[in-house]
């Protein structure tokens, strides 16, 4: 069978093989560097790290399915050629199509869930948490719904690899599912991109620091794989365009090369982007500090190791801060301003108490 298939004109399956051979090691290296960066700090493995591991397993399995589709299911050859030389290969192709589409739907959101968990740790504001939780629900719902639709979209199940007439009669509109299945990814990508920007830019910090932080989140959200390819948002859009412009069922084995590349690339880019966001300790170890230090209003400078955007902590037992800078003041006439109320508290005597919330750096730890 291999010799017959290799004789096909315009064979393009090798492109998919080369892509998998290059891209899969990149994801493995990215995850390995993430955990090495974590080992440089006192941080323990958390739920976000386990999601990254699961996403990497999903990426490796997807690469295996893609290679199997090339070797056993005729991907890269024209369907007409396969119909003449080896019709059974087309049946194998549609079986691989079910496996690939179901696996993609159920695993592509894992790395983005890890990013959501990271954002929840960085941004403690209640409103931000509501947006993040909603985004996570959308991701989980899209994964479960998409996976079930891909897997059980045909009744009987064997209609998945039946003739075109059988698929039309017994299956949902699978092509529309493939096209619009990426749309929730685009929406959640935009949310994760926009979410940190107002908070970061509103910090009482230098313009340089704010620019560095904005670029950090920007690289993780849009240019997450700047050194190796496209970005999470860009790959979602390009995958959507590819599926929209190229029918999955017109010369499917030939068009599958490009479509599978985007299907493997998209979650892999999310995975690399999620890893890039926590490389700060690694970059500092090799002499590439992202920020030289942060100066607070009190004049203290600390080397940043973990970025957090925290609410002011409530003093215990109603205690109040009795000193500002090097001087001291009486606690008379001052009250604690709640986390959700940042308005100045005006008391008798013309005293105004305000709280400035700035970047907090936790020494000896990393995101």
From Swiss-Prot:
Broad class of where this protein is predominantly found: membrane
Glycosylation sites: 133, 245
Highest taxon of the lineage: Eukaryota
Membrane-spanning intervals of the chain: 16-36, 50-70, 90-110, 137-157, 183-203, 211-231, 259-279
InterPro entries (alphabetical): Rhodopsin_dom_fungi, SAT4-like
Pathway the protein takes part in: Secondary metabolite biosynthesis
Pfam families xrefs: Fung_rhodopsin
Identification of the protein by name: Polyenoic acids biosynthesis gene cluster protein Ba17b
Origin species: Metarhizium anisopliae
């Amino acid at each position: 069978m291999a010799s017959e298939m290799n004789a096909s004109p315009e064979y393009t399956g090798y492109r998919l093989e080369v892509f998998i051979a290059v891209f899969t090691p990149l994801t493995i290296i990215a995850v390995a560097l993430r955990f090495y960066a974590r080992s440089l700090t006192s941080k323990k493995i958390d739920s976000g790290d386990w999601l990254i591991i699961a996403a990497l397993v999903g990426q490796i399995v997807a690469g295996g399915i893609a290679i199997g589709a090339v070797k056993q299911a005729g991907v890269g050859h024209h369907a007409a050629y396969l119909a003449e030389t080896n019709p059974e290969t087309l049946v194998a192709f549609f079986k691989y199509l079910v496996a690939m589409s179901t696996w993609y739907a159920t695993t592509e959101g894992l790395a983005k869930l890890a990013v959501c968990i990271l954002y929840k740790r960085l941004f403690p504001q209640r409103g931000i948490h509501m947006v993040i939780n909603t985004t996570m629900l959308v991701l989980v719902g899209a994964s479960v719904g998409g996976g079930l639709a891909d897997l059980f979209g045909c009744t009987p199940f064997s209609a998945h690899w039946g003739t075109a007439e059988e698929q039309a009669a017994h299956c949902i509109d699978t092509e529309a599912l493939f096209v619009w299945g990426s749309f929730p990814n685009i929406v959640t990508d935009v949310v994760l991109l926009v979410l940190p920007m107002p908070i970061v830019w509103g910090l009482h910090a230098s313009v340089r620091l704010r620019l560095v932080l904005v670029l950090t989140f920007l690289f993780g959200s849009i240019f997450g794989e700047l050194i190796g390819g496209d970005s999470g948002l860009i790959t979602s859009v390009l995958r959507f365009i590819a599926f929209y412009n190229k029918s999955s069922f017109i010369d499917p084995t030939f068009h599958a090369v490009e479509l599978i590349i985007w299907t493997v690339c998209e979650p892999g880019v999310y995975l690399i982007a999620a890893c890039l966001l926590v490389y700060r300790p690694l970059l500092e170890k090799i002499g590439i500090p992202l920020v030289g230090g942060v100066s607070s209003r009190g004049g203290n400078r600390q080397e940043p190791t973990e970025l957090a955007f925290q609410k002011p902590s409530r003093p215990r037992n109603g205690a109040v801060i009795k000193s500002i800078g090097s001087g001291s003041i009486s606690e008379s006439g001052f009250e604690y301003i709640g986390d959700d109320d940042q308005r100045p508290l005006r008391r008798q005597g013309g005293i105004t108490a305000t709280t400035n919330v700035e970047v907090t750096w936790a020494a000896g730890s990393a995101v």
